[in-house]
Design a protein with these regions (language model features):
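Hydrophobic or amphipathic alpha-helical targeting/insertion segments
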Residues: 93-107, 112-116
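Beta-propeller and closely related beta-pinwheel folds
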Residues: 68-81, 113-285
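Small/polar beta-strand repeat architecture
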Residues: 2-84, 112-116, 124-127
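Hydrophobic beta-strand segments that make up the repeating blades of beta-propeller
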Residues: 96-97, 203, 247, 341
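Short, ordered beta-strand-loop transition motifs
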Residues: 9-15, 90-91, 111, 289-293
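Short beta-strand segments and strand-loop junctions that repeat across beta-rich extracellular domains
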Residues: 58, 104-108, 151-177, 311-317, ...
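Beta-sheet repeat architectures centered on beta-propellers
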Residues: 51, 55-62, 66-67, 77-80, ...
């Protein structure tokens, strides 16, 4: 009965705690009369890895820093405690993982799904395994495990710019010898490694001010390291992703692409994103891809939220951007284990994306809204009197419709008002409307269940209509 997982109920002292025993149905059980109270000599307790913090926390003042490091009454420099981030990779059929700033863990598939990951130091033949790292990643063509921001051999002190790697095909051997390929290198540009992304026959490592390209070159050096560029980085350890044979990444105030060199991505929503951005929770930013629709997406916290509540998406084929609100904390694209993108919400649920047209069985507000447009740089009023819609409906169980809304204002800082709306169905050829303003925008929207539609190139009958 006791061979289950338990949460600690009470702390007795520094060396003791209690749990509430339960049966396989979850009901509380008590000891029988013959129980001696010590559990016997064969009881083994295995502890889960500390889940860590779910927020970035910073502070200063009394109690921060070391005793005696400053004068009485003097302030101390700030301290920070980072939220828990994981890097996970495949090593053949096995899985390796690393909590940022923690140890290295290995899960062996042959031991079965019910077994736990174990520390690398417990592997057979383990030698000089890193005790701390900020990320681990496998070099795909040669099967070395790289530990970024690891401790140096013989110490427990983390070196935030040190890259260490194990012997080829040997996750346990980290001692460099003339007879193996284990080794290390310290990067020079920057003060810490932010993260890394694997791409075509190389690994791109981001420090806080630079990008490095790491390539397998074989003995005696094993890896060659080239500085790609300085003055750019990525905003968080998971803010870069490999998609369409390129790496797309978000920095503190812009978006970039790496294709052998680094270029900025022209972004029409840049001010919208970075003018309302919670930099105190910047490490929660992560990048995701949706290969089916040629998209990369960054999820981030707006300035008024400590949890992810927004996203910005770039379509790398059409070279267009769109924005929205959504709380997701992790994302997995279509692969061998799923036929739809799978994402995690802040409510501890996993969601299938791109499946159906409803939001978990309820109606979903789906819309496409343009930016403002004008005629003659806003010197002329516009008059619109006709819409020729281009909407494809499919898979709907009823007579589906969408609503076209024309929003207007006469001055850039004026209030947007909805001037006219038009309901459009599958048989609508043309819709007559009336709206006049210097600036307009168009919103196409549906709010009912089972309404799956796709927007094409809508045409509008617009003419200039004077200056006042």
């Amino acid at each position: 009965v006791l061979n289950q997982e338990y949460q600690i109920a009470t702390i007795v002292n520094a060396n003791s705690y209690t749990i509430e025993a339960k049966d396989t149905d979850g009901a509380t059980v008590t000891a029988n009369a013959s129980d001696t109270g010590n559990g016997g000599s064969s009881v083994v307790g295995a502890y889960q890895i500390n889940v860590g913090l779910d927020d970035y926390v910073s502070g200063f003042g009394f109690g921060s820093g070391y005793f005696g490091e400053s004068s009485w009454g003097g302030g101390t420099s700030g301290f920070s405690s980072q939220l828990r981030l994981w890097s996970i990779d495949n090593f053949g059929e096995d899985m390796i993982s690393n909590p940022r700033g923690g140890g290295l863990f290995y899960w062996d598939k042959t031991n079965g799904e019910s077994t736990r990951s174990v520390n690398f130091s417990s592997l057979s033949g383990a030698s000089d395994v890193p005790t701390i790292a900020n990320q681990i990643i496998v070099s795909e063509t040669d099967r070395h495990i790289l530990a970024l921001g690891a401790n140096t051999i013989g110490t427990s002190t983390q070196d935030s710019m040190l890259v260490r790697w194990c012997n080829q095909e040997d996750a346990a051997m980290w001692t460099p010898k003339t007879t193996n390929t284990a080794g290390s290198i310290r990067l020079s540009a920057g003060s810490k490694i932010i993260g890394a992304v694997r791409t075509r026959e190389e690994i791109i490592i981001f420090t806080d001010i630079a990008l490095y390209a790491v390539q397998f070159i074989g003995p005696p050096f094993t890896f060659g390291v080239n500085l790609v560029t300085q003055s750019v980085s990525m905003v968080s350890p998971q803010a870069a992703i490999n998609a369409n044979n390129a790496i797309y990444f978000m920095d503190e105030d812009n978006f970039y692409i790496y294709e052998g060199g680094v270029q900025s991505l022209p972004c029409t929503v840049r001010a919208y994103v970075f003018d309302d951005f919670n930099y105190s929770q910047v490490y929660k930013v992560f990048a995701a891809k949706n290969a089916k629709f040629n998209e990369v997406t960054w999820f981030y916290c707006s300035s008024s939220s400590t949890e992810i509540d927004r996203y910005v998406t770039y379509n790398y084929l059409d070279k267009v951007w769109h924005i929205g609100n959504m709380d997701r904390t992790a994302w997995m694209d279509i692969g061998s284990s799923t036929d739809a993108p799978l994402a995690a919400g802040t409510n501890n649920y996993l969601y299938d994306h791109e499946t159906g047209s409803n939001a978990d069985g309820s109606a979903m507000t789906a819309f496409v809204e343009s930016a403002d447009f004008d005629a003659g740089d806003g010197n002329q009023f516009m008059f619109i009197n006709r819409i020729i819609p281009d909407v494809l409906f499919y898979g709907s169980s009823t007579d589906p419709t969408v609503t076209y809304s024309i929003k207007t204002r006469n001055y850039p800082l004026g209030t947007l008002t909805t001037a006219t709306t038009a309901s459009v169905g599958s048989s609508t050829g043309v819709s007559n409307v009336r709206a006049r303003a210097r600036q307009m925008r168009v919103r196409v929207e549906s709010t009912d269940e089972d309404n799956l539609w796709r927007l094409g190139d809508t045409r509008f009958d617009i003419r200039q209509d004077g200056r006042r």
